[in-house]
Each structure stands twice: as structure tokens, then as C-alpha cells.
Amino acid sequence: NLYQFKNMIKCTVPSRSWWDFADYGCYCGRGGSGTPVDDLDRCCQVHDNCYNEAEKISGCWPYFKTYSYECSQGTLTCKGDNNACAASVCDCDRLAAICFAGAPYNDNNYNIDLKARCQ
């Protein structure tokens, strides 16, 4: 769920507030359209697409689905006791948090004009 995703981001990018990722580029945060502005925004586009795939599992609601995972020294592991939906959502969030850690953060892409830049 979103609370767990926030904590995964804190695990892989402890130097930044997770809020920094809640309104970034065209895809980080609510919705998503147009061309991603950079690598970090591409991480969010992939995450959005991953959630769309997870939603194809019967009764799977990625934003609310809780799952079992572990954070140890910046390394995320999804636990084996997750059902198909939980495993899928956990992996979406894990891969996005790892992607965030490897992508440069450009302050100019925070809280951008979506209408102007994300067509």
C-alpha cells in the first residue's frame, strides 16, 4: 500500500523526504501523461504501469494492498508469504524504490506545470 511504499522509499533514499517524490515530473504522484521528464520520472511511469498490471489480478487494489517485506541496510526484500496480488504490488514498489535510489533528482522537475510539460 502507499504507506509501505513510502517506507520503502525511506529505506533506499534515506537522504530525501518521500514527499519529494509525491509531485515530481509527469508520473510521480497522481495520474500520469505525456513524456517522462527524466530517469526518475521514468521510474514512476514504470511503477504506474506495474500497478496497472497488478490490477488485472482479481480483487487486487495496489494502493491499498498490504504486503510483507523487509528493509535491511538499504536492501529491500519481498517476503515469500505474500499472495499473488501482494507479491506483485510489493515487487512494483520494491523496484520503484530501487529505481529512485539510482536516478538523479532534479529540483526543477518538482511540482511542474503538468498542462504545459506533460502533454
Curated annotation (Swiss-Prot):
Residues at the active site:
47, 93
Cite the binding residues for Ca(2+): 27, 29, 31, 48
Gene Ontology cellular component terms for the protein in this record = extracellular region
Q: Where in the cell is it found?
A: Secreted
Please provide the record's keywords in A-Z order: Calcium, Disulfide bond, Hydrolase, Lipid degradation, Lipid metabolism, Metal-binding, Secreted
Q: Which GO terms describe its biological process?
A: arachidonate secretion; lipid catabolic process; phospholipid metabolic process
What is this enzyme's catalytic activity, as reactions? a 1,2-diacyl-sn-glycero-3-phosphocholine + H2O = a 1-acyl-sn-glycero-3-phosphocholine + a fatty acid + H(+)
Q: Which Gene3D superfamilies does the entry link to?
A: Phospholipase A2 domain (1.20.90.10)
Q: In which tissues is it expressed?
A: Expressed by the venom gland.
Q: Which cofactors does the annotated protein need, by name?
A: Ca(2+)
The protein's predominant localisation is secreted
- Cofactor mode of binding and number, as noted: Binds 1 Ca(2+) ion per subunit.
Quaternary assembly: Homotrimer.
UniProt family annotation: Belongs to the phospholipase A2 family. Group I subfamily. D49 sub-subfamily.
Q: What else is known?
A: Is not neurotoxic.
Record-linked PANTHER family: PHOSPHOLIPASE A2, PHOSPHOLIPASE A2 FAMILY MEMBER
Q: Main role?
A: PLA2 catalyzes the calcium-dependent hydrolysis of the 2-acyl groups in 3-sn-phosphoglycerides.
User: What is the protein name stated in its UniProt record?
Assistant: Acidic phospholipase A2 2
